[in-house]
């Protein structure tokens, strides 16, 4: 039982945010994925869009709000931080979005706060976010 409660009580990590227009790197553990990295263990694709950045943000906001267990922590011009709480064990994962001013894409980073393995949860979550975003884009 201690294992299930430790996830929700994990403090917000220090390795969040932007530095030199980059999301911070993933730890060596496999429970993090990032679109601004080259190693295959952590690499994911960014989200591309063909609209204005404002329309892309609106679409991404729709996607986030449609998902269970979300809590928006930071939402400014170029950076968003969202906490995702898993349904059963109540673990908190941190998902970050970066909107570079000169590119029509959204960079992502998704990381578990606790543990070493995530059974692919962060990779699946980012794929799901990208899929839902692209599905909404088809309606434009």
Where are these regions (language model features)?
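Ser/Thr-rich, low-complexity intrinsically disordered terminal regions
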Residues: 3-140
């Amino acid at each position: 039982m201690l294992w299930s409660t430790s996830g929700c009580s994990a403090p917000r990590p220090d390795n969040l945010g932007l530095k030199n227009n980059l999301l911070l790197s993933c730890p060596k553990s496999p429970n993090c994925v990032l679109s601004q990295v080259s190693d295959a263990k952590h690499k994911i694709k960014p989200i591309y869009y063909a609209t204005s950045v404002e329309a892309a943000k609106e679409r991404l906001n729709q996607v986030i709000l449609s998902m269970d267990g979300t809590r928006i922590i930071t939402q400014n011009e170029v950076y968003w931080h969202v906490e995702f709480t898993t349904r059963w064990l109540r673990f908190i994962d941190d998902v970050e979005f970066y909107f570079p001013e000169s590119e029509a894409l959204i960079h992502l980073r998704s990381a578990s706060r606790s543990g070493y393995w995530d059974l692919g949860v962060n990779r699946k979550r980012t794929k799901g976010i990208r899929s839902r975003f692209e599905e909404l884009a088809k309606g434009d």
